[in-house]
């Protein structure tokens, strides 16, 4: 118990604070610049590890980033399978306005292939929760979810970015965590926690809304969803029921938005 396997994207995140967002054809100057490793899979693995789960993480990066990414994950206590690919890693450009709202553009970069999942099969089999996102290819997620189903590992899907999902894959998912805009088409997944940003989240089966606490003004919402999912996975792997796990994930995400950027904003349990 308490094991989480994560499969997802790792890349370089470039943060720029701007006085306001662009209008059409406009160039504006950023007020600050910050660069760190990120990606939904990477951030969620870190969040689960900081919430005291035993985390295994499968990802792909460009060859130039393989060693520093492995070192960063090792420093977080994450058992990693970082596959080096030719070409660049993923990149994300993140603009943040004074209210903490963001605009994000992602270049997908190095991609996992379905066959990369096979060497990760023992980690999936040993996990209590397999955490997936739509940042990796559908065939990769389907291969991983099939291995999870064969070994009794529950699949948690963060369905971002939104895309249509085949019924064959959705049948393998136990729990999804869409936001209000990603929820369409996921009704046949057995359970969902619908994230509502500053308003908290909603457990679909019970209709119960769980408000998010406040730990101060929001300065940066980037990565709040990743924190929510990583902490939710860690709590579920520990044996907590869904409502209790969602309450804890809500609080962790609410705390994260009071700190700028992502890695330094992901809280440590305790």
Residues of each region from the PLM?
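Ribokinase/PfkB-type carbohydrate-kinase core domain
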Residues: 1-10, 70-84, 94-209
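Glycine-rich phosphate/adenosyl-contacting loop at the front of the ribokinase-like
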Residues: 1-58, 68, 218
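Conserved phosphate-binding/catalytic region of the ribokinase-like
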Residues: 184-270
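Residues in the short beta-alpha loop(s) of Rossmann-like NAD(P)-binding domains
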Residues: 61-63, 161
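Gly/Ala-rich phosphate-binding loop of Rossmann-like dinucleotide-binding domains
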Residues: 49-50, 149, 237
């Amino acid at each position: 118990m308490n094991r989480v396997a994560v499969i997802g994207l790792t890349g370089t995140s470039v943060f720029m604070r701007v006085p306001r967002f662009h209008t059409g054809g406009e160039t504006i100057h950023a007020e600050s610049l910050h660069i760190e490793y990120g990606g939904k899979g990477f951030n969620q693995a870190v969040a689960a590890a900081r919430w005291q789960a035993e985390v295994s993480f499968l990802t792909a990066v460009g060859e130039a980033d393989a060693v520093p990414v492995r070192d960063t994950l090792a420093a977080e206590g994450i058992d990693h399978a970082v596959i080096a690919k030719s070409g660049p890693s993923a990149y994300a450009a993140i603009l943040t306005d004074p209210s903490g709202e963001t605009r994000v553009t992602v270049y997908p970069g190095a991609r996992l292939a379905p066959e990369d999942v096979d060497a990760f099969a023992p980690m999936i089999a040993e996990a209590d929760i397999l955490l997936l996102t739509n940042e990796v290819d559908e065939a990769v997620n389907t291969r991983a979810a099939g291995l999870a189903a064969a070994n009794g590992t529950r699949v948690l899907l963060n369905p971002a970015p939104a895309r249509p999902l085949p019924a064959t894959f959705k049948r393998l998912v136990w729990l999804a965590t869409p936001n209000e805009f990603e929820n369409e088409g996921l009704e046949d997944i057995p359970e969902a926690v619908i994230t509502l940003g500053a308003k908290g989240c909603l457990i679909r089966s019970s209709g119960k809304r769980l408000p998010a606490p406040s730990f101060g003004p929001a300065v940066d919402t980037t990565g709040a969803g990743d924190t929510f999912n990583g902490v939710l996975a860690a709590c579920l792997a520990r044996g907590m029921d869904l409502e209790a796990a969602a309450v804890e994930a809500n609080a962790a995400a609410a705390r994260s938005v009071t700190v700028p950027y992502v890695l330094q904003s992901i809280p440590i349990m305790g």
